Swiss-Prot record:
Family according to the record: Belongs to the EF-1-beta/EF-1-delta family.
Domain spans labelled GST C-terminal: 2-90
Role played: Catalytic subunit of the guanine nucleotide exchange factor (GEF) (eEF1B subcomplex) of the eukaryotic elongation factor 1 complex (eEF1). Stimulates the exchange of GDP for GTP on elongation factor 1A (eEF1A), probably by displacing GDP from the nucleotide binding pocket in eEF1A.
CDD domains: EF1B (cd00292), GST_C_eEF1b_like (cd10308)
Listed GO biological process terms: translational elongation
Region spans: Disordered: 78-115
Cross-link position per record: Glycyl lysine isopeptide (Lys-Gly) (interchain with G-Cter in SUMO2): 147
GO molecular function terms noted in the UniProt entry: guanyl-nucleotide exchange factor activity; translation elongation factor activity
Modified residues (Phosphothreonine): 88, 93
Subunit architecture: EF-1 is composed of 4 subunits: alpha, beta (alpha subunit of the eEF1B subcomplex), delta (beta subunit of the eEF1B subcomplex), and gamma (gamma subunit of the eEF1B subcomplex). Interacts with elongation factor EEF1A1.
InterPro entries, per the entry: eEF-1beta-like_sf (IPR036219), EF-1_beta_acid_region_euk (IPR018940), EF1B_bsu/dsu (IPR049720), EF1B_bsu/dsu_GNE (IPR014038), Glutathione-S-Trfase_C_sf (IPR036282), Transl_elong_EF1B/ribsomal_bS6 (IPR014717), Transl_elong_EF1B_B/D_CS (IPR001326)
Name this polypeptide is given: Elongation factor 1-beta
Amino acid sequence: MGFGDLKSPAGLQVLNDYLADKSYIEGYVPSQADVAVFEAVSGPPPADLCHALRWYNHIKSYEKEKASLPGVKKALGKYGPANVEDTTESGATDSKDDDDIDLFGSDDEEESEEAKRLREERLAQYESKKAKKPALVAKSSILLDVKPWDDETDMAKLEECVRSIQADGLVWGSSKLVPVGYGIKKLQIQCVVEDDKVGTDMLEEQITAFDEYVQSMDVAAFNKI
């Protein structure tokens, strides 16, 4: 298992393909699996790898919560597609002599046990929620205006990046390009969200992270279902 060399374009492409239908490296919540892979990536993936970039920006936002993310961090080769071998160069040996602080926490045995317990609790809660299937789920229909930088922005790529955002309780709908003047068109895209899982702040944060294509995002219409 692995992603190849995550410091190379080829390795980042493998990561991007792997995340095309996943929000996280493992499971349904950010975990130490995401931390391990995040640490191996030397920086933000390029904008054309929109799945990898969306994941990178999302995991980066958990920097303050890194110690409490569930799971036990394993070797990088334990994650990713089964048919790819990990060849990412590790800086673990060299970094022992440095004064740099590890971006994502320690391998403390006690902390790992606590993290494992926390992960099992969260998974149990998730399975419990799934099994209960509440009779009424509050949902909203949202129409978003996503504006590009100029008339040279690749709108097909912009829409691909937007639709790459996946979350439990989020379903993308129809879209169209609407002229705004000077040859510029904005993307108008519909989505349905479960109110207790997905909010407009989260959507705005993840959409505007694709800043090579996206200038801004506005909520054009918001209706309870």
